[in-house]
Amino acid sequence: MKTTYVNATIVTMNEQNEVIENGYIIVENDKIIDVNSGEFASDFEVDEVIDMKGKWVLPGLVNTHTHVVMSLLRGIGDDMLLQPWLETRIWPLESQFTSQIAVASTELGLLEMVKSGTTSFSDMFNPIGVDQDAIMETVSRSGMRAAVSRTLFSFGTKEDEKKAIEEAEKYVKRYYNESGMLTTMVAPHSPYTCSTELLEECARIAVENQTMVHIHLSETEREVRDIEAQYGKRPVEYAASCGLFKRSTVIAHGVVLNDNERAFLAEHDVRVAHNPNSNLKLGSGIANVKAMLEAGIKVGIATDSVASNNNLDMFEEMRIATLLQKGIHQDATALPVETALTLATKGAAEVIGMKQTGSLEVGKCADFITIDPSNKPHLQPADEVLSHLVYAASGKDISDVIINGKRVVWNGECKTLDEERIIFEASRYKRGLQR
């Protein structure tokens, strides 16, 4: 099946960050086979021609760190620091989740993400009461591209920890697929919730199965103090001593890093998922993304969960990410528009090991989203496309979402998820949770 999308303004995010003002994209099944300017007069014979009527077409956004199973917990635990937020709000509520609640919560997060332009994401979920097979099946039905990872903790007995490791390794072997729509990573929660033995076992699983690692690291000053007091090392050095960086690793946050740590992370191909809104809301601080990029660290933007954000709008994350760097460095050139877009598209895709997506180029997967600026005053005059995408647009502006060549959202309507049922069930299950 060959489909041509014509009469579009195409934000390619190729090496030159080229914007084609009047162009077309040809998709064959799940791949882009042509991106060009001008009127469609290709040598390709196509099955369908779709007039985009001047819509902006850009790569689908890539969210490098989420917890979609927590989507029912939006608005619970506002105005709290990270540790009391986790210990008195989030974990007690998550412990009440059944597999049915987890699926309903996940569906809500998927619906929010895909309708606001996210096509790929990397997720960590708490396995208490949760069937990973059910979560993976739910994500698969949505049509989204994802790395969904079972989070490991050292809660309970040593026997509990051993069982958690066995379960995690089983799922890694079952679901790891570097080039597929769904994959997984090894995901120890953090240095403060995992024993040394557990972190070492996670490193072993990653090496033996050649998978990536996903972990919260250096998120707060308290974490750094506590880990240093307990182990005599800061979190980065401690994680390295456990062997975690033997495989490509994504660290969520990296708010509290020094110059030596940034250089070390770059040298060991450790990537950072930057969660600006979540870090601000939990009072964790502001990650120095400018310094990370200068050190050579791969960075991708992320939302974290709705419980700490409180939405999954990647446009909002792009905007706050660039504004924060300008503010903390008192440098208006810090994190310019093109860089912010890169960190939400092709750069983010590289962070989570999905190089097959993130830009609109021949050979890439057909993952793209559209915005119609014609009826949106906040996107007018419409000629400064890149600027408007970062500083003015929002997830509510999305018209269409194509993932792997399939129309997942079309004219604002999600084709893969039952929006009315999902919202009803989310409200019903939320009322049943005991605070």
Swiss-Prot record:
It is an enzyme of class 3 (hydrolase). Substrate binds at residues 94, 150, 189, 219, 304. Its cofactor is Zn(2+). Pfam families: Amidohydro_1 (PF01979). Disulfide bonds: none annotated. It catalyses: S-adenosyl-L-homocysteine + H2O + H(+) = S-inosyl-L-homocysteine + NH4(+); S-methyl-5'-thioadenosine + H2O + H(+) = S-methyl-5'-thioinosine + NH4(+). Zn(2+) binds at residues 65, 67, 216, 304. Binds 1 zinc ion per subunit. Belongs to the metallo-dependent hydrolases superfamily. MTA/SAH deaminase family. This is 5-methylthioadenosine/S-adenosylhomocysteine deaminase. It comes from Bacillus cereus (strain 03BB102).
